[in-house]
């Protein structure tokens, strides 16, 4: 296989994705250059040393990427695949590179032009899977603990072929969780919070961290897209907004509506677990607000959105996360902070913060 990695991203955010992989690679003393084509929905990063591409996808924790939806090692671009046999050249690229991979994904970038190739990708998957199994490149059954084979079509008859590691990649096809919009939700923004739960919270921890009966606050709540997700998980919610909340949410008896400015509201309860916030405001102002809640011990976990400026978007996010981390540490607070541009996000990123309490002698564990 070659010295390149491919990263999927949102169309229009290729430069941010390129800046991110270049910076993270340099931190590992791996050097190369990014190839960027605007609005293509992907970035290629070419390493100067042959073995470095595999090192990158092993050693950079995937969850630390903000703008990348998927990462994989790829070979040279396969061009002009013969219509009578597209399978053999793809198989040839993988012979001796990978054995007994657990899954095959034939994918495209998330752009309108590329989506026209999806039907073809589905048709190719069956014969290709069969041929890869015959060559022992793919295991006889799907295995979530083995590497994933990616065939990434960028145009008809043109694809990159490569692999990712299942313990350090996105588990989703094309890096996109498939979520269905609930017809009774007050707004489409509800999908942002649902996706955030899938991305930031391991499935085996949902029962503990998204538990029935928890208390939550939604700042800038109306009409209730994010509150809806909390209601669905049987939480009790303080919804803060000067606007109107959807009557369907108020009728559940789980929502208390406070007509107030989300930036000025202060909670009266001491047992709030979740804080969520999707307000249209400058990123710095929102970051400072959430930091204040965490410093004051008003919540345990928070999910919030940062609306991005037109320029220097990557720098803006990094600066805000660093500012939050610094202020929390100054106040003696340990926290896990991760950000992701979700599929359902637009010119924004979603941030998740979780306070971590270290067990001190004689001190009650505040997590429970």
Curated annotation (Swiss-Prot):
GO molecular function: S-adenosylmethionine-dependent methyltransferase activity
Compartments where found: Cytoplasm
Disulphide-bonded residues: none
Keyword Hydrolase on entry: no
Membrane-spanning parts: none
GO biological process: methylation; rRNA processing
EC number(s) recorded for this UniProt protein: 2.1.1.186
Keyword S-adenosyl-L-methionine: yes
Function according to Swiss-Prot or TrEMBL: Catalyzes the 2'-O-methylation at nucleotide C2498 in 23S rRNA.
Subunit structure: Monomer.
The protein, known as: Ribosomal RNA large subunit methyltransferase M
Source organism: Yersinia pestis (strain Pestoides F)
Gene behind the chain: rlmM
């Amino acid at each position: 296989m070659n010295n390149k990695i491919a990263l999927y991203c949102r169309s229009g955010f290729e430069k941010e994705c390129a800046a991110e992989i270049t910076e993270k690679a340099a931190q590992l003393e791996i050097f190369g250059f990014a190839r960027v084509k605007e609005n293509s929905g992907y970035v290629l990063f070419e390493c100067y040393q042959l073995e470095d591409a595999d090192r990158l996808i092993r050693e950079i924790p995937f969850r630390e990427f903000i703008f990348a939806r998927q990462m994989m090692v790829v070979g040279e671009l396969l061009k002009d695949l013969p219509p009578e046999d597209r399978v053999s050249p793809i198989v040839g690229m993988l012979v001796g590179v990978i054995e007994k991979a657990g899954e095959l994904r034939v994918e495209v970038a998330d752009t309108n032009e590329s989506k026209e190739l999806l039907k073809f990708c589905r048709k190719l998957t069956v014969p290709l899977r069969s041929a890869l199994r015959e060559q022992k490149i793919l295991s006889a059954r799907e295995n979530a603990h083995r590497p994933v084979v990616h065939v990434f079509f960028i145009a008809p008859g043109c694809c990159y072929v490569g692999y990712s590691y299942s313990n350090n990649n996105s588990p989703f096809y094309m890096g996109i969780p498939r979520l269905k919009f609930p017809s009774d939700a007050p707004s489409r923004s509800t999908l942002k919070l649902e996706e955030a739960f899938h991305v930031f919270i391991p499935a085996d921890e949902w029962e503990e961290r998204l538990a029935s009966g928890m208390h939550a606050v939604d700042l800038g709540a109306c009409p209730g897209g994010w509150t809806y997700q909390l209601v669905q998980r049987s939480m009790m919610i303080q919804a803060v907004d000067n606007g109107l909340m959807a009557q369907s949410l108020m009728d559940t008896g789980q929502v208390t509506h406070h007509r107030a400015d989300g930036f000025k509201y202060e909670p009266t309860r001491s047992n709030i677990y979740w804080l969520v916030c999707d307000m249209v405001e400058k990123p710095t102002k929102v970051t400072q607000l959430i930091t204040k809640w965490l410093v004051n011990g008003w919540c345990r976990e928070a999910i919030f959105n940062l609306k991005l400026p037109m320029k220097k978007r990557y720098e803006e996010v990094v600066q805000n996360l660093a500012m939050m981390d610094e202020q929390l540490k100054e106040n003696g607070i340990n926290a896990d902070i991760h950000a992701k541009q979700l599929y359902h996000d637009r010119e924004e990123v979603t941030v998740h913060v979780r306070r971590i309490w270290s067990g001190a002698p004689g001190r009650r564990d505040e997590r429970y």
